[in-house]
């Protein structure tokens, strides 16, 4: 069985095609196009025509690669920029026509869950509680979990693209602009960092482009073996400031498209290290696309992890499953009468709501 995950991210659009073999997902091909969607928001909060066209042209090329695949084997998702843009629906409708499949705009917590799931399958099995930090173009997901299950997760509205555009828009880098970028990123975490601070987890990992790029640069400069520490980040920050301009940033292994947003990414990562009191962070493969693939595979094989989470909660609190099923059946029948063309996914959410409602009633007795 072949599956495809399409990630309409704030920095880049990505496609991952994989096949399912037993419990394993094996990648057959991956494609990435740097779009910088987050840099294409105008002063009124709308995606500019230029940004939309960049994205739609990339999706047309992606559509060629998924031609012939069953539509229910494909999941396309949008993240923070498409959550925030006032005219995102206009873009989504055009994107769906090109891809010939639904584009789902992920809520922040769902994005965090999928990020953790993708990383958890890529990392060695462990009983330790893990922190995953994923710095994207316009948001940063912080997630704590164990095994393959998220315990706590949130998406913060700060990323490498929007930070770079705001604080290094003239392409100049100074100690002052870097410090402002770090303080701004840290302020976004204010009030929520206590949930993710050291003491709530045993191991810290980072995923996606910023963390991977920083790890590679630190290893190439022989500052570390690829592990990331605050001391190493401060050294890298000083080198970037010394370059004085985005155009003059040069490190072995640094790709051109990553250079554009490296300063913003470093600022966000330093803020995360300071606020969450991280000593050392290692790189985790996986992240959102792999989380989508494993989630999709679970649904196709009737092993949806969300179903398992609801069932575990009902069992833990001895909820009345028969009563929950009766309520769920009535709710779904009413829903299908009112919305005959609604998807099975919508009906599934209603059943979970009935299950969790019954669990809540059990707790309150």
Q: Model-predicted segments: where are they?
A:
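Short linear Ser/Thr-Pro motifs
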Residues: 10-12, 139, 284
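N-terminal basic/disordered segments at the start of proteins
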Residues: 1-27
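Short glycine-aspartate micro-motif
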Residues: 3-7, 130-134, 204
């Amino acid at each position: 069985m072949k599956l495809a995950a399409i990630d309409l991210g704030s920095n880049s659009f990505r496609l991952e095609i994989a096949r399912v073999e037993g419990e394993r997902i094996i990648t057959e091909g991956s494609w990435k196009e740097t779009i910088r969607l987050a840099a294409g928001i105008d002063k009124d909060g709308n995606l500019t025509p230029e940004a939309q066209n960049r994205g739609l042209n990339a999706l047309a090329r992606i559509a060629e690669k998924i031609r012939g695949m069953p539509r229910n084997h494909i999941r396309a998702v949008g993240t923070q920029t498409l959550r925030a843009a006032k005219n995102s629906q206009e873009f989504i409708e055009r994107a769906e026509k090109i891809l010939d499949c639904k584009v789902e705009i992920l809520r922040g917590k769902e994005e965090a869950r999928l990020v953790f799931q993708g990383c958890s399958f890529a990392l060695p099995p462990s009983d330790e509680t893990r922190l995953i930090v994923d710095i994207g173009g316009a948001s940063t997901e912080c997630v704590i979990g164990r095994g393959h299950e998220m315990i706590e997760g949130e998406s913060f509205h700060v990323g490498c693209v929007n930070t770079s555009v705001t604080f290094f828009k003239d392409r100049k880098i100074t100690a002052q602009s870097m410090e402002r970028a770090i303080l701004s990123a840290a302020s976004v975490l204010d009030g929520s960092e206590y949930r993710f601070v050291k003491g709530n987890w045993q191991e810290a990992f980072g995923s996606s482009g910023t963390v991977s790029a920083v790890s590679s640069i630190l290893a190439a400069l022989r500052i570390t073996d690829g592990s990331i520490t605050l001391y190493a980040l401060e050294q890298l920050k000083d080198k970037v400031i010394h370059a004085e301009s985005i155009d003059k940033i040069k490190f072995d292994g640094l790709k051109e498209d990553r250079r554009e947003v490296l300063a913003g990414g470093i600022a966000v990562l330093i803020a995360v290290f300071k606020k969450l009191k991280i000593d050392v962070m290692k790189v985790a493969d996986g992240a959102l696309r792999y989380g989508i693939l494993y989630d999709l595979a679970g649904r196709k094989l009737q092993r949806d992890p969300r179903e398992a989470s609801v069932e575990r909660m009902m069992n833990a609190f001895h909820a009345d499953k028969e009563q929950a099923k009766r309520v769920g059946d009535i709710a779904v029948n009413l829903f299908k009468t009112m919305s005959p063309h609604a998807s099975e996914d919508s009906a599934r959410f209603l059943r979970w709501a009935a299950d969790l409602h019954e669990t809540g009633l059990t707790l309150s007795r």
